[in-house]
């Protein structure tokens, strides 16, 4: 048979004009339209006033299957940072063998424990870091729904990762170190990525809060100049350990408040830095929690975060709190089967569980 399109150019143009009247600002043709249809449409709507609606800009990260919005007044969010071989000998050994089983497990555990975004870092000796980063992005995006944060000290690795990432990623990070700064900003623009602004320069750590503010303004101005927007930026509060600098927390708080109130910028910080070298770090971390990037593998921190959101009446926080406590109760409920009484709880069908969770590496073992 032959497909027939009966709409004439004149009829097509009339419909287009009605769309413009209703507020549509972009129109065109598809199957069945010819150059005559497009010319008639253009002639018809050219004299009409086009309504250009300015949609509010939003801080949004995406994966293949999930969108995460970062709102200045929204609930606390966690960036999971466990996928990093630094200090993890077992993970390093697996990566040298080309295995990503631990990476998949870490990704899944962090997502299940409340992480909204997952940081991915493959920086270690003895591997092809770029190829391992690409392999990891493929496996992690297959395993979990969370958007990813691409973390590398090498510009070419960040760009290669952004090129294949199926969504809008977060770059960790862009500082005022000239060699990287001049390359990474255009890369963020090219791939439409958000980025973490790290207030460091070639001179090293800023000596005080004012120097930190100046670095933030310098990077912000450069980003705006090339067409990026404030909503594309998350400022790292640059937390130092309070054991070495008694003013570390206050300086971080100052940076966060300045960025939010004066510059309308989102902020983040590495929670564990504040308590480095101190005993019973959990208490220091908990006190710092509301402005922190936490390790979502620690239930106590995540439970405190969800409870804090509820007390501050953040949108949807009551439901999140109830759901989380229900999940916690289910995890802690006494098991009745033989495996549980023996101290281990195995899935009824391990192979099915591996397939369901995309854990290809363990299927043969089962």
Positions of the model-derived regions?
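Domain-level signal for soluble alpha/beta catalytic cores
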Residues: 1-236, 240-366
């Amino acid at each position: 048979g032959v497909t027939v399109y009966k709409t004439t150019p004149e009829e097509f143009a009339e419909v287009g004009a009605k769309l413009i009247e209703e507020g549509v600002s972009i129109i065109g043709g598809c199957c069945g339209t010819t150059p005559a249809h497009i010319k008639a449409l253009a002639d018809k709507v050219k004299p009409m006033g086009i309504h250009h609606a300015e949609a509010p800009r939003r801080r949004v990260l995406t994966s293949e299957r999930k969108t995460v919005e970062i709102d200045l007044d929204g609930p606390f969010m966690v960036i999971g940072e466990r996928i990093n071989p630094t200090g993890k000998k077992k993970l390093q050994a697996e990566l040298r063998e080309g295995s990503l089983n631990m990476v998949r497990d870490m990704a899944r555990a962090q997502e299940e424990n409340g992480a909204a975004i997952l940081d991915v870092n493959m920086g270690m000796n003895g591997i092809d870091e770029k190829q391992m980063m690409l392999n990891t992005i493929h496996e992690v995006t297959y395993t979990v729904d969370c958007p990813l944060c691409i973390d590398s000290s090498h510009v070419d690795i960040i760009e290669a990762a952004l090129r294949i990432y199926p969504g809008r990623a977060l770059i960790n990070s862009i500082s005022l170190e000239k060699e990287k700064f001049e390359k990474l900003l255009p890369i963020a623009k090219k791939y439409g990525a958000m980025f973490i602004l790290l207030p460091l320069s070639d001179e090293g750590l800023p000596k005080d809060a004012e120097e930190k503010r100046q670095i933030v303004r310098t990077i912000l101005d450069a980003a705006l100049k090339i067409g990026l927007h404030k909503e594309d930026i998350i400022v790292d509060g640059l937390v130092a350990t309070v054991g070495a600098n008694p003013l570390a927390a206050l300086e971080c708080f100052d940076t966060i408040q300045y960025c939010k109130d004066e510059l309308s910028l989102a902020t983040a910080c590495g929670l564990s830095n504040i308590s480095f070298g101190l005993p019973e770090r959990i208490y220091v971390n908990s006190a710092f929690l509301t402005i922190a990037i936490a390790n979502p593998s620690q239930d106590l921190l995540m439970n405190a975060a969800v409870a804090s959101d509820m007390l501050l009446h953040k949108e949807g926080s009551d439901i999140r709190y109830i759901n989380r406590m229900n999940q916690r109760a289910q995890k802690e409920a006494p098991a009745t089967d033989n495996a549980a009484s023996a101290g281990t709880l195995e899935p009824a069908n391990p192979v099915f569980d591996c397939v369901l969770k995309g854990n290809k590496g363990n299927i043969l073992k089962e």
